[in-house]
Swiss-Prot record:
GO terms for biological process: clathrin-dependent endocytosis; gastrulation; insulin receptor internalization; protein localization to lysosome. This is Lysosomal cobalamin transport escort protein LMBD1. It comes from Homo sapiens. The gene is LMBRD1. Pfam families: LMBR1. The modification Phosphoserine is found at S528, S531.
Length: 540
């Protein structure tokens, strides 16, 4: 009875923390979506869909520290299991986490392959005023059916794809791999779900390489460099207006005597008049920003922004160094591409892999660090998306602007962030493989010692950090790790993706260093949906 009560207490602690994270996530998603959605084109359904899909992704990531916490707290620091942690209780705890993953991953599949596409196509059809609601729903369902078919194919392939590994590899290593995956289960339903989620994670990896890697270098450098002075930009703009007005006056003077203008002059006049309208619109925006209290407040916070920029670039360098050492470890010590570069433990230590187990001894510091890492990925991804925009090959589909993002763009944004957040679980594993696999678990090993006072040798049990050499019944592997490595070919793709991530980060760092300061109205003159009577994207 006492054993059951202690186990329940441990579960309550873990899930209470998860509940607090859940509330924080919902609040963050609401603020985040409301900040970027268009004030003029705000739609209730698209807003709720965006908030819900982003929240589901973040909640799934929040399961990672819960998973690690539960497997770690089943054991004492001396390597022994706690009194309540017998085989049945341990299995019950592991199944609880597994069912949590089942539920959340199923909801993610529903969002990605049905709900988000349906809402997106519904609003695409809504732009046509002549279309009835019934027709809009039918058309949206017709297009969504294609996504449902893709999901069904992924589930079928995942359920029956062979997982046989090459026979020319070390048999001991593969026995260990097989025994680990047997813990996760061998049902076709689980394999289908794992394959589908891994496919989405692979797309998330491509999004992370495109947006997160660039944003990780662009965000801190933009904070450090700041923006150009509104007063100086306004002075330059005034000079440009005077110059364009002189050109217009010169061209118009040619027709004072009643002679018609040549075709070339007409084209030039039209271009100058269009340029003048743009410059006057910029003048209004710059005047508003120069006189706003928000600009003065941001100017007072300039030193703080520089400090944050330096902090973010140091964090980025910490991540890059940890990721490089982890990938180098796999390149040197894993079984190769046919095994998905799976490696047990860490032969080359990296800063984060050493830091996280230490923080876990002081609850809940590791939760805080994992949350910071996930939020850092979110903010840098958003910075990358804002700088690059949403593209389909060479065609720019949408721009993300504060207070001016259309419902369709908002759905695209949350879809990309959902996929990136899915990939963060593997990124965290890449940064701290030992922590994600075993947490802070220890196990006991027998060591022979020789004593001068007593003849012969004696045996002493000493704790050791859990690794691949530990007996199967002494260390519990997290469910997260098993989900991530169910299919070796995805692990191989993630490995090469990490190298691409490092390369894009370095390229982005060079590009961001070479770029000058941004305009205070960056992107305003590009936005076709800005009316002349609206002062600025920063007016909110």
């Amino acid at each position: 009875m006492a054993t059951s009560g202690a186990a329940s207490a441990e579960l309550v602690i873990g899930w209470c923390i998860f509940g607090l994270l859940l509330l924080a996530i919902l609040a963050f998603c609401w603020i985040y979506v409301r900040k970027y959605q268009s004030r003029r084109e705000s739609e209730v359904v698209s807003t709720i869909t965006a908030i819900f899909s982003l929240a589901i992704a973040l909640i799934t990531s929040a399961l990672l520290p819960v998973d690690i916490f539960l497997v770690s707290y089943m054991k004492n620091q001396n390597g022994t299991f706690k009194d309540w942690a017998n085989a049945n209780v341990s299995r019950q705890i592991e199944d609880t986490v597994l069912y949590g993953y089942y539920t959340l991953y199923s909801v993610i599949l529903f969002c990605v392959f049905f709900w988000i596409p349906f809402v997106y196509f519904y609003y695409e059809e809504k732009d046509d005023d002549d279309t009835s609601k019934c027709t809009q729903i039918k058309t949206a369902l017709k297009y969504t059916l294609g996504f449902v078919v893709i999901c069904a194919l992924l589930l079928l392939v995942g359920a029956f794809v062979p997982l046989n590994v090459p026979n020319n590899k070390n048999s001991t290593e593969w026995e260990k791999v097989k025994s680990l995956f047997e813990e996760l289960g061998s049902s076709h339903g689980l394999a289908a779900l794992s394959f589908s989620i891994s496919s989405l994670t692979l797309i998330g990896m491509l999004a992370a390489i495109t947006y997160t890697a660039y944003g990780m270098s662009a965000l801190p450098l933009n904070l450090i460099k700041g923006t150009r002075s509104a007063a100086y930009e306004r002075l330059e703009n005034t000079e440009d207006i005077e110059e364009v007005e002189q050109h217009i006056q010169t061209i118009k003077s040619k027709s004072k005597d009643g002679r018609p203008l040549p075709a070339r002059d007409k084209r030039a006049l039209k271009q100058f008049e269009e340029r003048l309208r743009t410059l006057k619109k910029r003048e209004r925006h710059l005047e508003f920003i120069e006189n706003s209290w928000w600009t003065k407040f941001c100017g007072a916070l300039r030193p703080l922004k520089i400090v944050w920029g330096i902090f973010f670039i140091l964090v980025a360098l910490l991540f890059v160094i940890s990721l490089f050492l982890s990938n180098l470890d796999k390149a040197l010590h894993s079984a190769g591409i046919d095994s998905g570069f799976i490696i047990f433990g860490a032969n080359l230590s990296n800063p984060l892999n050493m830091l996280l187990p230490l923080l876990q001894t002081v609850f809940p510091l590791d939760y805080i660090l994992i949350t910071i890492i996930i939020m850092y990925f979110i903010f840098t991804s958003m910075a990358g998306i804002r700088n690059i925009g949403i593209w389909f090959f060479w065609i720019r589909l949408y721009k993300i602007r504060r207070g001016r993002t259309r419902p369709q763009a908002l759905l695209f944004l949350c879809m990309i962030l959902l996929l990136i957040v899915l990939h963060t679980s593997y990124m965290i594993y890449s940064l701290a493989p030992q922590y994600v696999m075993y947490g802070s678990q220890n196990y006991l090993i027998e060591t022979n010692i020789t004593s001068d006072n007593h003849k012969g040798n004696s045996t002493l049990s000493v704790p050791k950090r859990c690794d691949a050499d530990a007996p199967e019944d002494q260390c519990t592997v997290t469910r997260t790790y098993l989900f991530l490595h169910k299919f070796w070919f995805f692990s191989a793709a993630y490995y090469f993706g990490n190298w691409a991530f490092l390369g894009v980060f370095l390229i982005g760092l060079i590009v961001s260093c070479c770029k000058g300061k941004k305009s205070v109205i960056e992107g305003v003159d590009e936005d076709s949906d800005i009316s002349d009577d609206e002062p600025s994207v920063y007016s909110a």
